[in-house]
């Protein structure tokens, strides 16, 4: 069940609307590198979890990624370029004639669509490879359940035909990019979305974990004995010298 915060409560809590000093809760935690990662953080605030198990899993994932000594190289401009590329309306046809004629036209007289493909496809291919490598480098037995689920989804996605074709390519060429475009915007489009959505979620969780570590914030401790909240040392992030209180 999804819990949606109403507009009045959002304003009262100053989650998104800036206070007099120009700050909001969202601005404090909005440290993700990618636009997709920022969108994930915003959604977390707009629709908070209500299931204690899901809350625990997310907290464990945030803590884990925040302490991880290595991470993905998030290239915001490349990701934005990829998103524009995926929104092209002319979905390529899977025929040798169409592919050949389009490749020849692009080679002899490249237009804007060709330029977009030729730039975005290598960006996307590199991103897919890097995410696969990153997931493989995580120790399966020590990662939180939420991260393990992501690993499994990425593994299943990379096992698909189009992704295997990408992995098998040793050299980058004009023809290879045109061929990969058939997969990326065709039969593997949903797989590409899995890759991007996973990257954005990892980016958001990592940024929250890093922010918590840098600011000295603590993570909740869950107990199964009773349903109540107890907070020690609560203070307002916006104040320079806040007085801590127990609630």
Question: What is each of the regions a protein language model found here?
Answer:
Residues 1-161, 165, 198-201, 234:
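Conserved amphipathic alpha-helical "coupling/scaffold" segments
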Residues 55, 150, 157, 181, ...:
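Intracellular alpha-helical coupling/juxtamembrane segments of multi-pass membrane proteins
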Residues 4-8, 192, 214-215:
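Low-complexity, intrinsically disordered or weakly predicted helical/coil tracts enriched
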């Amino acid at each position: 069940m999804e819990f949606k915060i109403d507009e009045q409560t959002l304003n009262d809590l100053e989650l998104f609307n800036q206070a007099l000093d120009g700050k909001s809760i969202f601005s404090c935690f909005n440290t993700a590198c990618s636009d997709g990662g920022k969108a994930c953080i915003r959604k977390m605030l707009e629709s908070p979890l209500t299931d204690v198990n899901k809350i625990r899993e997310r907290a464990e994932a945030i803590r884990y990624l925040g302490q991880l000594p290595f991470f993905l190289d998030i290239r915001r401009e490349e990701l934005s370029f990829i998103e524009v590329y995926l929104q092209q309306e002319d979905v390529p046809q899977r025929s040798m004639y169409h592919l050949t004629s389009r490749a020849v036209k692009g080679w002899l007289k490249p237009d804007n669509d060709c330029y977009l493909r030729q730039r975005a496809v290598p960006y996307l291919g590199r991103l897919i490879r890097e995410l696969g490598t990153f997931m493989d480098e995580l120790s399966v037995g020590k990662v939180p359940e939420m991260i393990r689920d992501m690993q499994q989804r990425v593994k299943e996605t990379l096992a698909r035909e189009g992704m295997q074709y990408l992995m098998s390519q040793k050299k980058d060429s004009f023809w290879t990019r045109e061929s990969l475009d058939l997969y990326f915007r065709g039969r593997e489009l949903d797989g590409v979305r899995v890759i991007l959505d996973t990257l954005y979620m990892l980016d958001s969780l990592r940024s929250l974990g890093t922010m918590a570590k840098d600011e000295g914030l603590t993570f909740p401790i869950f107990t199964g004995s009773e349903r109540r909240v107890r907070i020690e040392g609560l203070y307002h992030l916006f104040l320079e010298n806040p007085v801590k209180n127990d609630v």
